[in-house]
Amino acid sequence: MKWIGKNVVYPQTSIEMNEQGRVFLSFVVEKDGSISNVKIERGISTDLDREAKRVIQKMPKWIPAESAGKTVRCRARLPINFRLN
C-alpha cells in the first residue's frame, strides 16, 4: 500500500530509541468504504502504535465487501512496517 508508506511519519522519539518492527492492526471496512473500529492487535511501542493507528484512520475509502450482491461491513487486518534506514 503505497499510500501508507507516503503518509507514515516516523515519530522522532522512536527514531532516537531505534524502534523498528511491524504493527498489526484490525479495523472494520464499512458499507460506504470508510474505516472504523481501528485496534492495535500487536504493537511495538506507544508512539509507533499511535502513528500506525493514525495512518489507518486517515486512509482513503476502501472498496467495501459484497455478499449476495449487497455491500456489507467486514473486518480487515493490516501490518504496517516501521524500519529505519
Where does each model-flagged region fall?
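Short proline/glycine- and basic residue-enriched helix-capping loop/turn segments at helix->loop/beta transitions
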Residues: 1-25, 53-85
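A short, well-structured alpha-helical segment
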Residues: 2, 30, 34-64
